[in-house]
Curated annotation (Swiss-Prot):
Pfam families: Methyltransf_5
HAMAP family for the chain: 16SrRNA_methyltr_H
Gene Ontology BP annotations: rRNA base methylation
Originating species: Salmonella choleraesuis (strain SC-B67)
Function: Specifically methylates the N4 position of cytidine in position 1402 (C1402) of 16S rRNA.
GO molecular function, one term: rRNA (cytosine-N4-)-methyltransferase activity
GO terms under cellular component: cytoplasm
Gene: rsmH
Protein name: Ribosomal RNA small subunit methyltransferase H
Superkingdom assignment: Bacteria
Length: 312
């Protein structure tokens, strides 16, 4: 495995957002290359525990080099965190969950993973190459209308129908298997070019999100967090594009408001208690400073949102 450099975005801020207790139990739902996990471990005492999760086999290989009895790694999607926690009898005892969403720099920089239009490689895009359909397989079998919907929904691509038609026509002639081929087809089908962005940017994002069910993963993990967090436990979540951040922002806002009851609706105290109260308290958001963006341009679009589990 090549050693691709990865600079962890908002490292200190995300871990500080967890408000680490030395004897606490924490989850790093996106281990990656271990930047957040190592910092969390450095702040834990002997009684502390860190459960890390990743579905990328390369990340698992890195995690297995950490020889620390307080640390354990799980190969799987973070959407199943409630199951992992229940297996260890930690339900309701988790003091913090950190998620660093999206694709990592090592994944983007490794041409063999097929995430980037900047490097020619197999058209794969799977976070876990051992499971599910690759991007090439999906694009070769999907209907034109479905491809267009994915590009529009997950890439916010205004030329989605044109690009989908071009992809289907190209695959009919000769199936695409390389990232360079897809990038060229998209560029040729895009009538108006953005001088600041490669024409394939939105298509690659959309296909990657679809192949990995990324938004569903986020929604399920957020929902599960409410059942596993202890009162006062923290959520610290880094997003990299508007679709991710929209889901996180909406979830934290809704759970911070509690049940919405029409004004003037007659209710007994027992009925109000049955509805429950606020599940979370939103603690705000942070964005990278100029220095971090200058040192790591990929940090530019990142947003960190932090929330705390209430006693509800």
């Amino acid at each position: 495995m090549e050693n691709f450099k990865h600079t962890t975005v908002l490292l200190d801020e995300a871990v500080n957002g967890l408000n680490i207790r030395p004897d606490g139990i924490y989850i790093d739902g996106t281990f990656g290359r271990g930047g957040h996990s190592r910092l969390i471990l450095s702040q834990l005492g002997e009684e502390g525990r860190l459960l890390a999760i990743d579905r990328d086999p390369q990340a698992i290989a890195v995690a297995q080099t950490i020889n620390d009895p307080r640390f354990s790694i799980i190969h799987g999607p973070f959407s199943a965190l409630a199951d992992y926690v229940a297996e260890r009898e930690f339900t309701g005892k988790i003091d913090g969950i950190l998620l660093d969403l999206g694709v990592s720099s090592p994944q983007l920089d490794d041409a063999e993973r097929g995430f980037s239009f900047m490097r020619d490689g197999p058209l794969d895009m799977r976070m876990d190459p051992t499971r599910g359909q690759s991007a090439a397989e999906w694009l070769q079998t999907a209907e034109e209308a479905d491809i267009a919907w994915v590009l529009k929904t997950f890439g916010e691509e205004r030329f989605a129908k044109r690009i989908a038609r071009a992809i289907v026509e190209r695959n009919r002639e000769q199936p695409m298997t390389r990232t360079k081929e897809l990038a060229e087809v998209v560029a040729a089908a895009t009538p108006v070019k953005d001088k600041f962005k490669h024409p394939a940017t939105r298509t690659f994002q959309a296909v990657r999100i679809w192949v990995n069910s990324e938004l569903e993963e986020i929604e399920q993990a957020l929902k599960s967090s409410l059942s596993v967090l202890a009162p006062g436990g923290r959520l610290s979540i880094i997003s990299f594009h508007s679709l991710e951040d929209r889901i996180v922002k909406r979830f934290m806002r809704e759970q911070s408001r509690g049940p919405q009851v029409p004004a003037g609706l007659p209710m007994t105290e027992a009925q109000r208690k049955k509805l429950g109260g606020r599940e979370l308290r939103a603690l705000g958001k942070l964005m990278p400073g100029e220095k971090e963006v200058a040192e790591n341009p990929r940090a530019r679009s990142s947003v960190l949102r932090i929330a705390e589990r209430t006693n509800a």
